[in-house]
Design a protein with these regions (language model features):
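Domain-level recognition of nuclease-like catalytic cores that cleave nucleotide substrates
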Residues: 142-202
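Short catalytic-loop micro-motif centered on adjacent basic/acidic residues
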Residues: 105-109
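Interdomain/boundary linker segments immediately adjacent to catalytic/signaling cores
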Residues: 1-82
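Catalytic cores of nucleic-acid endonucleases
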Residues: 110-167
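Active-site metal-binding core of divalent-cation-utilizing nuclease and nuclease-like domains
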Residues: 50-58, 62-101, 112-121, 128, ...
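A broad, low-specificity signal marking well-ordered, structured residues that form hydrophobic/aromatic
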Residues: 93, 104, 175
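Structural motif
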Residues: 102-104, 134
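Residues at the C-termini of beta-strands that transition into short coil/loop
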Residues: 82, 139, 181
Length: 202
């Protein structure tokens, strides 16, 4: 799998010039690149099949699971509960890495566009409350989105709202959106079913 775009929404303070960010960026890039299909192929080939009809298209959650497993191998904490923007038990962040007394968070979108908004908002509030030093939401590009099941949030659909997050008055922190995409498209590979073990893809 490949990273094709990074949109930086907030970059305040020294973090993006730090060795911590260089390590985080490298690990995220390596974890994306490690996601492959079919297993053992060395690249990510998506089945050329629209996800609009029931029982067609490739599942999103196994792709996310493969990426998260690789971050776990790098020592990231998975499914971290951080009290950021909730009054009840907070929903977990997909992956976090300690940076000093704060956390850097990564979310990989498997829900719809409303879920994407919630993820970015949660990380933005984390910056405002100084609980996060930074955060990244990873989304499929529109090119990959068409082959995935369900109506998963995607980069192009979220882009019109980027100015809103850029306008936030954050003293210090980093917030970005990454777009990921397949390496190849083929009718000769199987679809990724929703029940596929994510470990098989990494």
């Amino acid at each position: 799998m490949k990273l094709v775009s990074t949109e930086i929404l907030i970059d305040k303070g020294p973090f993006s010039s730090s060795s911590d960010w260089q390590e985080i960026k490298t690990q995220i890039s390596q974890a994306i690149k490690a996601v492959e299909w079919p297993p053992g192929s060395g690249s990510f080939t998506i089945r050329k099949q629209s996800g609009k009809k029931r029982g067609e298209g490739s599942g999103v959650k196994p792709i996310k699971a493969a990426f998260m497993a690789k971050l776990g191998d790098f020592g990231w904490n998975l499914e971290t509960r951080v009290d950021i923007a909730t009054v009840k038990t907070p929903g977990p962040l997909d992956a976090t890495k300690p940076v000093g007394d704060k956390l850097f968070a990564v979310e990989w979108e498997t829900g719809n566009i409303s879920s994407s908004h919630r993820s970015v908002n949660k990380m933005a509030v984390g910056l405002l409350k100084k609980k996060l030093v930074g955060g990244i939401l990873i989304l499929p590009t529109r090119e990959l989105y068409q082959y995935l099941t369900d109506r998963v949030g995607n980069f192009r659909e979220l882009a019109p709202y980027f100015p809103m997050w850029r306008a936030l008055n954050v003293d210090e922190g980093f917030l970005a959106i990454m777009g990921v995409e397949h390496d190849l498209v083929s009718t000769k590979v199987p679809r990724i079913s929703k029940g596929t073990n994510g470990r098989a893809l990494a």
